[in-house]
Design a protein with these regions (language model features):
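Alpha-helical recognition segments enriched in aromatics with Gly/Pro capping
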Residues: 1, 5-11, 117-262
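Residue patterns forming the tRNA-binding/recognition surfaces of aminoacyl-tRNA synthetases
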Residues: 1-131, 226, 232-233, 237-275
Length: 275
């Protein structure tokens, strides 16, 4: 196939593969490339149009496609037993409609990129030395070994949670007593990130589903239906709400107004109902 050519570095600056545009910021480089095409007579036309651009969820910086080496887990063999477990009723979902959501994701699953280029996290347990590669939590014997600089996706440790917290891989008394469990209570927004992966991990590493029942709670959203978050600043202070309306009124309002199996769109005015 065609050679894989990377034209910018990790900071969005054009690299040595960019010729005359080397050292330019990506935004300036775009303008220079267009101008160069026009000067050479290769620019047929320009037109305005709208295109979706991915953004970092933290800083909202536009994301650039970037070729790099990453670690992946082949997921299809892991998904097959998890699909069968749901179809046979070994794992049941409440509300029941989430079974379809769970199955649809697993039946169309893609390989999982588990490596991240972050300064914090669980280090990937792979070591390199002079063309050698070793997989080990601890550094191999001898000098000169260098650990992989990437860390694992946070969900990679989370999918092991049902049995890792009980002492696994050791066969501890807690592991024998509490795994598998009966009930998992969580939010439906992480059914893919966590629930499905925990089922896959349990079947792969323990030979059993980690829980038989999954209950999805409602999610408290703002009046516009957005998930509450620090970055949006749309989450009310519960202490202030309780001081204003009373703790019992807040509790009753949330319980009474939340529709069964659906998310609640929160408006402070609705706390008057509870009071």
């Amino acid at each position: 196939g065609l050679p894989e050519v990377v034209v910018m570095d990790e900071h969005g600056v054009m690299n040595d593969n960019s010729g005359d545009f080397r050292g330019l910021d990506r935004y300036e480089a775009r303008q220079r490339v267009v101008a160069a095409l026009a000067d050479a007579g290769y620019l047929e036309k320009t037109e305005a149009y709208t295109v979706p651009v991915g953004q970092c969820h933290r800083c909202h910086t536009p994301i650039e496609p970037y070729l790099s080496w990453q670690w992946f887990v082949k997921m299809a063999p892991l998904a097959a037993p998890a699909i069968e477990a749901a179809r046979k009723g070994q794992v049941k979902f409440y509300p029941a409609r989430y079974k379809k959501v769970y199955l649809n994701w697993l039946e169309n699953i893609r390989d999982w990129c588990i490596s991240r280029q972050l300064w914090w996290g669980h280090r990937i347990p792979v070591w390199y030395r002079d063309g050698e590669t070793a997989v080990s939590v601890e550094a191999p014997a001898g000098d000169g070994w260098r650990q992989d600089e990437d860390v694992l996706d946070t969900w990679f440790s989370s999918w092991l949670w049902p049995f890792a917290i009980l002492g696994w891989p050791e066969e501890t008394d807690d592991l024998k007593r509490y795994h598998p469990n009966s009930l998992m209570v969580t939010g439906a927004d992480i059914i893919f990130f966590w629930v499905a992966r925990m089922v896959m991990a349990g079947l792969e590493f323990r030979g059993a589903v980690p829980f038989q029942h999954v209950y999805f709670t409602s999610i408290l959203r703002d009046a516009q239906g957005r998930k509450m978050s620090k970055s949006l600043g749309n989450s009310p202070d519960p202490i202030e709400m309780m001081e204003r309306y009373g703790a019992d009124a807040v509790r009753f309002s949330l319980i009474y107004l939340t529709p069964t199996g659906q998310d609640l769109l929160f408006d402070e005015k609705r706390l008057e109902t509870g009071r």
